[in-house]
Amino acid sequence: EENTTRTNVHPYVVTQDLLIPSNILLTIQEGVELRMFHGSNIHVEGQLFINGTEENPIHITAYSSIENNRWGAICFTNALDTSYISHTKISGASTGIDPSVHHGAISSINSHIVISHVEIEDVVFPIYVEDGSISISESVLSCDYICDYINVKGGDALIENCTFFGSDVENTDAIDLDNVNNGIVRNNRIYNFNGSNSDGIDIGESSEDILIVSNLIYHAWDKGISVGQNSSVNV
């Protein structure tokens, strides 16, 4: 019923879905560790500030390291205002509250999120965005599952100064933009997307005016940059 701040006095264990209602701001301060039970989610309808620092990052991990004991996802659904995630390490996530919609460890549906200095590893699908907007910078993503590391469908996207470590799995792109207008993909490093039909950057579904500049792409099995389905880009 009121805005809440969580500090790093001790680890917090999330045993079930954590809902942030539309009239609430939850702030998680530097150094906090969240240990997530199997299948539990952070569901944001209001606003979330995850405020790690370089010296004291925030860790969001599975409660148990037992194989396949994965937690859900951080899900933004029609969130009231822009949320921010900075200097945070995310691991052990799967899919969100509605797996048919919340595909990513960070899933944003018709919401606005700003992400910086985030490390995502050992997840099923790093980031999925549908409408709204995403700005992500200075972040590192890796994954061993078939997915697109950042998949944006509709809305606005700024992806810059990020590093993507690929794998040998098939049908996996580092960045996939669909029906995005005025997106920017800039100064990223993309390594070793070696599975069949895998691209570094894939622009499709009538995306328009996408700026792609100063990206380094090493060893993409299919295409470094793929543009199709009536899309337009500036490279």
Which residue stretches match the model-derived regions?
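Beta-strand/loop edge motif enriched in small/polar residues
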Residues: 1-235
